[in-house]
Each structure stands twice: as structure tokens, then as C-alpha cells.
């Protein structure tokens, strides 16, 4: 495993972080024991950076992560970097954004309990909340840093001007945006902003929500409780087009003697503004395949070939809270 310093945080983190969105109930049923084994295997293979969120099952994902790392959180706490996110609230009508000071404080306390830790290394605002001023949100997190409950503050799904507004009260230390071969809009604004301000970037969705694993087809049937079952990007003509693009990528990956998953993850890490790629897994075998991507180097010619292949694909966006 390779490591890097996460922007201005000073945290030494593995270039691939273990993500836990898939353990929160939005991706269908899963075997919890297998998921715990996957987390533990990731740690054995050198991963020291783990990302979760209060909204991933509202405590469920955090509890699984805490259980999987229970011994390590006792014996090697200083070697682990635990990141979580807050600022979403579940209502009868679905998820809503709530980055109010009161909800963030409650969220931090709930996450500490669910994870079984006394502090959170990196706490991120999950989505910008247009109903609460950036100064209020940032001010509340600054107090939580002073209280010792969180170590560093980041944001997720923010654009450049939202980060600038937030930083007027408290410097944004990290950004967690969506980024993969089928979704590259942050290359124009957010990534240059982060490079200019030494903001650590940990990207989520490098496998395009499963599309870049090469395991999906027109015959794939998503479970009813998997958000992709109602997503237009995983059906219809755009999906067919992207499956053809994935097949072409898989052929190129084979030429490089890597899997398509490894190629996709390595591509995100090849961007000089990206520090870390967050990759989720439910099984040990998925972990071992994904982590090997940290050692894959892509030449400029390789990147050009990938760009040519991707020019035939359609954009793949993920869900927002309002769509979950």
C-alpha cells in the first residue's frame, strides 16, 4: 500500500480508503460477517483510512466499522484515520439536508457512540445545506474541534464557491467529491481550487457505482432496496452505451495486465489533485483486487487511450439526498 499526506491535515493516509456506503442499506442486503471480514482484510493489507457516514443506515454502517476494527481501535488508534460525515437527517418523507449547529452536534455524539471512539479524526459535512449559513455550520464544527471531539474538518459534495464561503469562518481541510471515468466535472473547478488551497481530496465512487467493475450487464437485476434499481443511468440506451464503453476499457485493461477495477481506481489516483480514492467492498476478494490499484502506474499514453475510449460514454451521476 502507498501512503500520502492528506492536504493540510498532516494526516498520513493510505491512498485507497475503505468506504462503507454499501453497508448502510442503500445497496440491497449483504452478509455482515463477510463485510466485517473485508474491513479487517483491508487493514491487514495496509489500509489505515476508513470512511463512513451517519446517514449510511443512521448508525448501522458506523457500528459495523467500529465492530470490525474494535481491537485495532484499542491497540493502534494513532495509526488509524477514521472519517465520517454528518448533516443529513431522516424524515418520514426521506433524507433532508440539515447542517444546523444543533443537528451537527447531535450527529457527532451519535457517531462517536456508534463507532465506539472518543474522537473522530476527520468530520465532513455530507452535503451543503442552503437553509443554514456556512458561517453557522463552520462555527459549530470549530467548537467541536475545540472540544476535542473531532480533529479535522472537511466537506463533501461542495463546489468551489461553497468551500470558499465556508473557509471564511473555518478553513476547509478536505473535500470528498464524486469522481470517476464517467463523471469528471470537478476537473474544471473543484480540483484546481483544492490544489491552490492545499485541500486534501478523497474521491468517492471511483468504480461508477459498480459500472466500472465489469460485472454488470443488460441482464443485471438490482434488488428493490438498491438505489440503482430506480436510477435512469442504470437502464435504457445510456446504460447500453456505457456497457459497451466498459467492454472496451476492459480490453485495454487486459493489455496492461490489470483488471478494469484496478484501471479505474488507478486513473483517479493519477490525477495530481487527488490524494485518496474511497473504495467500498462487501467481500474479501473485492478488497484484494481493489487495493492492488494503488501500485498501478499509468503512462501519459495510457491516459490518452483511456480518454479516447471514454469519449463514447455517457455521464453517470449518483443520487442526491432528495433522491434516496
Predicted regions and their residues:
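N-terminal binding-site loop/beta-alpha segment at the start of enzyme catalytic domains
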Residues: 1-80
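Aromatic-lined glycan-binding groove of carbohydrate-active enzymes
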Residues: 186-225
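N-terminal small/glycine-rich loop or linker at the start of catalytic domains
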Residues: 8-26, 83-96, 119, 124
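Glycine/proline-rich, positively charged
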Residues: 40, 44, 91-185, 189, ...
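Active-site beta-loop-alpha junctions enriched in small/polar residues
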Residues: 21-23, 53-55, 85-89, 125-128, ...
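Short helix-capping segments at alpha-helix termini
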Residues: 71-79, 115-116, 144-149, 167-171, ...
Amino acid at each position: 500500500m502507498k501512503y500520502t499526506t492528506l492536504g493540510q491535515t498532516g494526516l498520513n493516509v493510505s491512498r485507497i480508503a475503505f468506504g462503507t456506503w454499501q453497508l448502510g442499506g442503500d445497496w440491497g442486503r449483504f452478509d455482515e460477517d463477510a463485510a466485517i471480514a473485508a474491513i479487517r482484510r483491508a487493514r491487514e493489507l495496509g489500509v489505515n483510512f476508513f470512511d463512513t457516514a451517519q446517514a449510511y443506515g443512521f448508525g448501522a454502517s458506523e457500528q459495523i466499522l467500529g465492530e470490525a476494527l474494535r481491537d485495532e481501535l484499542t491497540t493502534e488508534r494513532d495509526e488509524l484515520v477514521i472519517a465520517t460525515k454528518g448533516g443529513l437527517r431522516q424524515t418520514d418523507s426521506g433524507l433532508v439536508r440539515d447542517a444546523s449547529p444543533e443537528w451537527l452536534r447531535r450527529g457527532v455524539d451519535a457517531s462517536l457512540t456508534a463507532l465506539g471512539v472518543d474522537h473522530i479524526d476527520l468530520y465532513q459535512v455530507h452535503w451543503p445545506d442552503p437553509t443554514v449559513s456556512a458561517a453557522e455550520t463552520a462555527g459549530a464544527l470549530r467548537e467541536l474541534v475545540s472540544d476535542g471531539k473531532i480533529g479535522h474538518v472537511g466537506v463533501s459534495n461542495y463546489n468551489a464557491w461553497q468551500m470558499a464561503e465556508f473557509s471564511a469562518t473555518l478553513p476547509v481541510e478536505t473535500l470528498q467529491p464524486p469522481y470517476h471515468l464517467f463523471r469528471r466535472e470537478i476537473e474544471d473547478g473543484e480540483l484546481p481550487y483544492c490544489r491552490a488551497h492545499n485541500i486534501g481530496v478523497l474521491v468517492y465512487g471511483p468504480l461508477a457505482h459498480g459500472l466500472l467493475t465489469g460485472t454488470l450487464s443488460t441482464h443485471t437485476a438490482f434488488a428493490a432496496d438498491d438505489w440503482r434499481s430506480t436510477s435512469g443511468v442504470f437502464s435504457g440506451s445510456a446504460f447500453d452505451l456505457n456497457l459497451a464503453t466498459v467492454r472496451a476499457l476492459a480490453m485495454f485493461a487486459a493489455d496492461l495486465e490489470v483488471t478494469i477495477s484496478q484501471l479505474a481506481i488507478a486513473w483517479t489516483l493519477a490525477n495530481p489533485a487527488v490524494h485518496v480514492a474511497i473504495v467500498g467492498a462487501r467481500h474479501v476478494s473485492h478488497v484484494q483486487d481493489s487495493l492492488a490499484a494503488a501500485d498501478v502506474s499509468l503512462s501519459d499514453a495510457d491516459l490518452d487511450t483511456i480518454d479516447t475510449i471514454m469519449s463514447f460514454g455517457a455521464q453517470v451521476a449518483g443520487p442526491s439526498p432528495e433522491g434516496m
